[in-house]
Amino acid sequence: MSQSVLHPRGLCGNELKLLAILAMTVDHIAWSLFPGYSMHPLALLMHAIGRLTCPIMCYFITEGYHYTKSFQKYALRLFLLAIVSHFAYQFFSFGGHVGWRIFLPFAYGNVLNQTSVIWALLGGLLMLRVNDLDCSALQKTALILLLCLVTLPADWSCIAPLCILSIGANRENPGAQLRWCLFYVSLYVAVYCLSLNVWYGLLQLCVFLSVPLLRLYDGTRGRSAALDRVMKPLFYAYYPLHLFILGLLRAFL
């Protein structure tokens, strides 16, 4: 996953992001067609495909952090997207039946999966910033633990931010990236198995199917500047928009 192993004829950033969008859509359609922890083979297959999304998202947060000209603008865009996506996520999760409690954290009686993965991605971006601060290791650790707490209610919880930190902090060491991500995802799998569903917990290990795809990353954003200008707003708009549409379908079908 490091820049030192770029594939000369691989996939550009836009292509990988489109794959992530496709996998995410398949996953969310599965939640709509097969509510709960369905053991239907098609549901399991669709959810397995969906596990490709989060690692690709995490990886490109680290790329965005590395290449951005303005961290503040990048963080603000993610923050605004996280706010919009929260309501789309709740609307989708509750089949269009949401009330005023949508504005209250943990109002639905659960700590996990209370808001979208965008909040977790923002937390990961902030962890990368903390890691580069000129302060003591103790201060960095305290700030990172605080961000873990803040991102706990998000989809993928604090695991996605910690994976982002691991990838960004080991940019030239793909072995370390993989080891740390395996460690954090294993923790997530254990918690999922113990608190939610064993089979769906084990299903989270399918995130590592994304590794061969990320190894094909050629280090470029896209094939043309004109297409890049179209793709950037698309990537930001698609997440909340598709959740809202699926929420409408769940509400009326």
What are these regions (language model features)?
Residues 1-253:
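Alpha-helical transmembrane segments and their immediate juxtamembrane cytosolic regions
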